[in-house]
């Protein structure tokens, strides 16, 4: 019974759906504000930048990025229809004004032309990518030359409770940095959230 519950919750975290998915999304919206603010602060967003978020969830980080790119454009893809609906409601004004586009999609096959974005980022999404190197290459394809990619994770030893390892792959930052290298990124570095904030995050950054 416990294993089935763990599997169900892990699946919902990766692809929220239905009433429980809405609950997960609300929890993400409340619990990941720091993660979103910290990650976006590392992106050095310019007012006219074009930005892509992979796995935007309830749309909190997308909203913060859009506020930074005040005269730019933010696109986002998520494979949860429930999260697309929730994030679209949260960001309705930006979408209506043409500053943002949120849609259902798959990181392994991005429906954007080559060199479309200055920056791409993702929070707590890479755990669910079945082939992370190929997904990173696909993101690299849609980044402009020397475009920035940032991936934020919680290090694997900080995860409590346990998750279903058949559904979700946990990482340390240096492991993802190695994936970045295999995918052809350069100037790769790992940033660690300030210990005094008592939030355990690592953000891996690299240039296309």
Describe these PLM feature segments.
Residues 50-109:
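Class I SAM-dependent methyltransferase SAM/SAH-binding core
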Residues 146-153:
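Conserved beta-strand signature within the Rossmann-like core of class I S-adenosyl-L-methionine
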Residues 119-131:
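A short SAM/SAH-binding and catalytic strip from SAM-dependent methyltransferases
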Residues 133-145:
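A short glycine-rich, Lys/Arg-flanked "PGG" loop and its adjoining helix->strand segment in the class I
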Residues 20-40, 169:
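Conserved SAM-binding loop and adjacent beta-strand
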Residues 183, 192-208:
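Core SAM-dependent methyltransferase catalytic element
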Residues 168-183:
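Short alpha-helix
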Residues 108-119:
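A short acidic, Gly/Pro-enriched loop at the edge of an enzyme's catalytic core
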